[in-house]
Amino acid sequence: MISVITYKTAVNINSQEKRSGMVRGLYTAYTGLVNQQKRLDVVSNNLANATTTGFKKEGVTTQSFDSVYGIKIKDATVGYMNQNIGSMSLGAKIGETYRSWDQGSLRNTDSNYDFALSGKGFFSISFTNKAGETSTLYTRDGSFQMNQEGYLVTKDGDYVLGESGDPILLPTDASQLSVDSTGAIYADGQYVDTFGIVDFEDYDYIEAYGENLYRAVDGAVTKDSDAVVNQGYICLLYTSDAADDK
């Protein structure tokens, strides 16, 4: 009778171990699928924005879960003490999503209101959200235009800021607008303002806001930018770079 109970117990234990192993295998496969789906989403977004002015591609890293140690509880062979029986891996997970800040290619547009930055830095934008809250955001997209009041604005109508932090106001009757490599703006040869171009000590302290804009988070430290302003150009992401994470 005792031997039968022991046999049944052993069978039950083996069945439980098989089911446990099957579940672990399914979970490992699941985490792999989740990782690949995230990578596909990122690459698809990069490709969709390959011609978006000032867009910076994203990438993802993969890392394995920490190993889990298996323990046999109250092992009779060692005085009913817990016994380590090995370790197992539960697959991989997304480590982090990062953004590449490499310089993109410049495309000539011959528009006096298109500007591309060569080097590190961002245009400063006064952005008002749907709740009516206004804050300073940043962009690499220099496709601007002049509104009816003479202010330099983004394609969405947000004000472009000068180095003083105020919106850039242009004379509406000016026939020629020129900008030098430092970002100084001239209308018919007369100085008007200078682009408020800023850079950051650590890009880990800026995050994507949406609409091709970025915002500084707590701890962000700004610094002067040495970026060169190119009038009549826009900055694009290389299409091949957009897909090189595949």
Predicted segments with their positions:
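Amphipathic alpha-helical polymerization modules
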Residues: I2-D241, D245
